[in-house]
Each structure stands twice: as C-alpha cells, then as structure tokens.
C-alpha cells in the first residue's frame, strides 16, 4: 500500500511529503506517538522503493504542530533508524499549521549510489 512519491535526479532522491498514516492500512492514528512510528516506517519504505537504504538519507525535514515537544517524540525512532550519532543525516524541525489534521509530516533527501 506504499504510495509515497518523489523525484529522482541522477543519484539524488527527494521524497514527497510523508504523513503519519499506517503504510499498510492508510489509517491515521490520532496520537503523536503512532504518527511518529508510521512516519519512520514510511521513510524506510520510500527510500527502499527508490533503490536505497536509510544509510543513503542525508537530510530529513519534519513539520510538527508543536516542535518544542515534538522533537522529544522523534528522538527514539530517530536513534533506532540512525543509531550512529556520528553518521546521522541533518534534521530540521519546523512548525506545522495548527489546523493541519496531522501531528507531523516530513520529507527527506537521499543520495543513492552516488
């Protein structure tokens, strides 16, 4: 049920916006924790669909309703996906509009086979 899109230029892959929907059912959990878990599942599926791995990701942008508290919610999944603190991608967290139905969204840039 993977539906993420993106763009490819040479070895660069730029994802489309990724939400916290469950990649299998397309349902959106109501809570931040569930959406964070699903966002990281979607990131992995998207980069693998492009022929890469999470090791190819060089930057992730997150938009969150409350970036100050949201960053803490990201940290556990971030450390699981990128366990080596010396080789993690750049990460930027920005404010998401208060009227957005999602707790967070993200996009990423990867360089695959470059």
Each language-model region and where it sits:
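Short, polar/acidic, helix-capping and beta-turn segments at strand->helix junctions
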Residues: 1-114
């Amino acid at each position: 049920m993977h539906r993420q899109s993106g763009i490819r230029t040479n070895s660069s892959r730029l994802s489309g916006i990724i939400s916290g929907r469950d990649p299998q059912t397309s349902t959106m959990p109501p809570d931040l924790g569930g959406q964070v878990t699903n966002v990281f599942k979607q990131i992995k599926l998207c980069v693998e669909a492009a022929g890469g791995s999470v090791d190819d990701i060089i930057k992730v942008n997150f938009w969150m309703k409350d970036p100050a508290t949201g960053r803490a919610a990201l940290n556990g999944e971030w450390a699981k996906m990128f366990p080596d603190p010396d080789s993690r991608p750049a990460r930027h967290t920005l404010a998401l509009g208060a009227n957005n139905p999602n707790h967070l969204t993200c996009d990423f840039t990867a360089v695959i086979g470059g």
